[in-house]
Each structure stands twice: as C-alpha cells, then as structure tokens.
Amino acid sequence: MLKKDKSELTDIEYIVTQENGTEPPFMNEYWNHFAKGIYVDKISGKPLFTSEEKFHSECGWPSFSKALDDDEIIELVDKSFGMLRTEVRSEESNSHLGHVFNDGPKESGGLRYCINSAAIQFIPYEKLEELGYGDLISHFDK
C-alpha cells in the first residue's frame, strides 16, 4: 500500500490536505484523467474512489459519484467563504480532500464528490496487485 509522510508533500499537496486549500480548476493532474484504476489518499494510501465512479463534470476537478467505502470518508459542514458546503476528508489521515455536492448524475445517486488531485494518487488497474491493492480487482469485474 502506498503511503507518504506529510514531510514529503509538495507545497500544493500540503496546502490542500493540511490547510484545507483548493488547487486551481483545470490545472491539476486528474481533472481529465479517465484511465482504469483506483484513487487513494495521498498520505495514508487508503483506497477512496475508483475510475468506475469517475465522471466528467466540467468543474475542473476530479469528480466521482460515490466513494469506494463510505467508512473511509468523513463529511463535515463547511461554512468558509460565506458558503454552506459539505467538506470531504479522509478518515485515516484526516486530510482535506474536497467537497461533495448534490448535483451529480441522478442515475448514480445524484452526488458529485469534487476532489483535489493534490489529495489523491492514481493507481492503474494493472498495478493493483503489485502495489498491495489486489483485493480491489474484483470491483472491476462486476
């Protein structure tokens, strides 16, 4: 399983995950990335989302219709910047991931997890076994 010490984070990774920051839309690694695989917490390595739930939302950040495991996600009320939103954090590392909104695809439950690329790492399907995520291969064989 991939893990990263907080001292190894880049400036933007630290700002996003530890200071509740947001990276620029359309200028991040995964906003337009649709390869088959999983997205894990940048710090803990815990699986959070899969490419099966990723969709193109035109918002400029990676968007997912649901989390891989709801127990790995914490949702908190966020009243920053004069808005009322739902913040999404990783349960294991308590890292800020992004926000969840109710404007996702209706056929997939209506949620849009809007996630900062700087908070996640993509693991290609072909590397799941090698990197310790082999138990998730069956998720793609449904």
From Swiss-Prot:
This is Peptide methionine sulfoxide reductase MsrB. InterPro entries: Met_Sox_Rdtase_MsrB, Met_Sox_Rdtase_MsrB_dom, Mss4-like_sf. It is an enzyme of class 1 (oxidoreductase). The lineage of its organism: Bacteria, Bacillati, Bacillota, Bacilli, Bacillales. Its EC number is 1.8.4.12. Stereospecific for the R isomer of MetO. Transmembrane segments: none annotated. One of its GO terms (cellular component) is cytoplasm. GO terms for biological process: protein repair; response to oxidative stress. Belongs to the MsrB Met sulfoxide reductase family. The active site is at residue 114. GO terms for molecular function: peptide-methionine (R)-S-oxide reductase activity. It catalyses: L-methionyl-[protein] + [thioredoxin]-disulfide + H2O = L-methionyl-(R)-S-oxide-[protein] + [thioredoxin]-dithiol. Residues 2-125 form the MsrB domain. The gene is msrB. It comes from Staphylococcus aureus (strain NCTC 8325 / PS 47). Pfam families: SelR. Keywords: Oxidoreductase.
